[in-house]
Amino acid sequence: MLKNRLAVAAITVAALTLVPAGGAAASGCDPLDTRSCLLPFPSNFNTVAQKGSDTSLRLNFSASQFPKNVKGKSGFPPELNRNDGFSPGSALLTYVPGIDIAKTGAAPITDIAQYSKANAPIVVIDVKTGQRHPIWAELDTNADAISEAKGQLLMIHPAKNFLEGHTYIVALRDLKNSTGKTIPAGAAFASLRNGKPTGAVKARRAGYEKIFKALTKAKIARSSLYLAWDFTIASERNLSERALSMRNRSFAALGDSNLADGKVAGKAPVYKIDRIEDYSTAQSTRIARQITGHVTVPCFLTKGCATGGTMSYAKSKKGKFDSIPNQQGTMQALFICRIPRAAMTTPARPSLYGHGLLGSPDEIDAGNVDDMASEHNMMFCATPEIGMADEDVPNAIELLGDMSKFSSMADRLQQGLLNELILGRLMINPSGFAAAEAFKSTSTSQSAIDTSALYYDSNSQGAILGGALTALSPDFKRAVLGVGGMNYSLLLPRSVDFDTYELIFKPAYKSRLDRILLLSAIQNLWDRGETNGYGQHVTNKPLPGTPKHDVLLHVALGDHQVAQVSAENEARTLGLVGRRPAYDAGRSFDKTPLWNIPSLTAGNAGGSALVIWDSGPCRIGSVFETCLENDAFDKLGGVGNPVAPTGSVAPRLGRDPHSRPRSTPAARQQKSEFLKPAGKITEVCPANSACHSVGWGY
């Protein structure tokens, strides 16, 4: 992610317009956790039977259950109730008064393997298989959570995403307080557990008997339980059907209805060139030409696909629960392409590039991108990742003060994915860019583009959204996701970039607990446009009508902007192998580094992998120094950074390593070798060392 895309002035003005207001008590709350109406979250308490749904359920929230902003408006986005289950990356949230995580012995982020201990106090079981799901648990350690009365949620995170369409049971048992005493169950749950439910929970007895039976089978004693509940994950179709429908109809209109074969067919998308800039060698020794234009893309949003537009859906057929977006004309998507000088003699490999947080395709002229283009003869093209592009900043500001409107971001992200797919097809269709004079070599008069294959190479937000794009892509089969991760509800509270957002978010929703709940809720919509919702289909299990893909995930150790833990969760979800040694001594907080991620070997180097890049400990020149916060350390000429904190806070010490991997020649060499038709993950670091970013020697 790139920092401070939201204009501080705009944020300040918007924040000042929020005025306090009271709100009525919510109804329809689960009595099993009375701290907040949404707790425990997620829970099948908030679902209803739905005919035609792939899970036989749909979400069933109401506005009265959601936190209100200071204007008194509920943060409930109605689009949530189109989901047939919850996010595959859901954090499991509840409030346990007085819990001490260490005394309880719950699996921590530093030792995930503890989840499988026979007496593990926090267990998540897949109802279908009876197997435990790997998790780690923490209390919210953000300063606002600690200072807020009853503000520290128990947060249980999946170490890899939950399976689509599966139902899980959460079991909390033998929880301890700071003195080591067992925390008693709440009255409502105790009545269910003891077989004598009363009041509001009496009608749930039959359902809970099934839960207790499953837990008994898993050797979890009913009498030991503090709390248990179940939840169901959204189905593959529900998560992806909007984007797949948009893709399939758009490519069919071009004359290509067989996208699974990975072959280009039909006509090229319509486009126009607005500007051609030829550079002298004095202007750029690396890039020969930049071309700016617009490509015509089917539009599936209101407002002509402008920021704030949302989807409308075709009427479902009888007995069908689906969400198929209506096409609403077309839109003109901006593109920028840069042709390297090397392409004037040898056609360049074409690659899409995705920009940073709330950024723009102008980032395609960054030094590291031009280096990659020049060193490895690659032509990069970019289009705004609308939904989260610079033009969406006003909408983002509005959403932070009113989360009920969040579907406008999620919907436009999916349109942005389609725009990138259409641009990619234009790059490799022989009658597209390759046939245009603007894309021909000035030396040979031949096309400067090698149209035999398309690739994806991106960083930060471009990588977070890029996993979703990869899962949907019919044209590129290999993607590099640089300094990325997945699951914004996990990423943002652990990112320094969130400081800027909270200039609006905190005044609008004053409780940290409410803000965490809202982030967790909107993740169910965010999934439709980022890797978290497509994780099970990025590599090994392609979506319908889609070829298989491989990815190379580059991670910056201790990244200040994209939480490293989210990248490792992504690696486990995507089935990646990991380059070892991943860390030098003392450079990981994990008892078992890269836990449950197999090792990269010569035998699997043709597949998908995770590689961690280390900028080294804090130092000024060659002298190791105490780490200061990023800006202060930067002013002193400091480089390097410590390992990320283990809590739910952002790393702030040392120089932010976020941009270092892409600035490292060895990392670019590794990317280039991977981004070939028969590419592999090559070894570019000493065999007995972790990979070091530029500036940190071996």
Predicted stretch roles:
Residues 1-10:
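Bacterial N-terminal signal peptides that target proteins for export
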Residues 430-493:
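Primarily recognizes the serine-hydrolase "nucleophile elbow" in alpha/beta-hydrolase
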